[in-house]
Amino acid sequence: MARRIHQPLEDQEFDFVLSMAPGPVLAYFTGTWPKAAPACRAMDTVVGELAEEYGARLTAVRTDMTRCPGTTRRFGVTGAPTAVLVSADEAVASQAGPMTGEELRAFLDTHLGELG
């Protein structure tokens, strides 16, 4: 069974999830418009698998850009999909565009290693 991925319905819910996370948060921003939808659905699968693999080291949050516009602006996200690694309420790394499992794993390993 895949580890649960949080899906906030509004900015305040995103902030709540962020405040309750015991460590780093992978916020991946998605969109529902036609050009973004296929890549975002593919990222759902990739993030789901890695959330299971990383377990308690990481909290995954699927962030709909339309439902969480303040969060989207706060982290400087301009397109979907975009992955943002957040620690202590600050973005420590971001990567725009779809990623394979290997690419996302490399992104996480690099930046989680920098966090200690």
Question: Where are the model-predicted features located?
Answer:
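N-terminal "domain-start" segment that seeds a small globular fold
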Residues: M1-V17
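Thiol-based oxidoreductase modules, predominantly thioredoxin-like and allied folds used
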Residues: H6-E10, F29-G31, M43-D44, G48-G70
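CheY-like receiver
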Residues: F16-V17, T71-R74, F107
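Residue-level signal for alpha-helix termini/capping positions
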Residues: L18-S19, E52, L112
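Short active-site neighborhood of thiol/selenol oxidoreductases, capturing the structured segment around
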Residues: M20-K35
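Structural micro-motif
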Residues: G23-L26, P69, F75-V84
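Conserved phosphotransfer microenvironments
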Residues: A37-R41
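Non-catalytic, surface beta->alpha helical segment in thiol-disulfide oxidoreductase systems
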Residues: G79, V84-G116
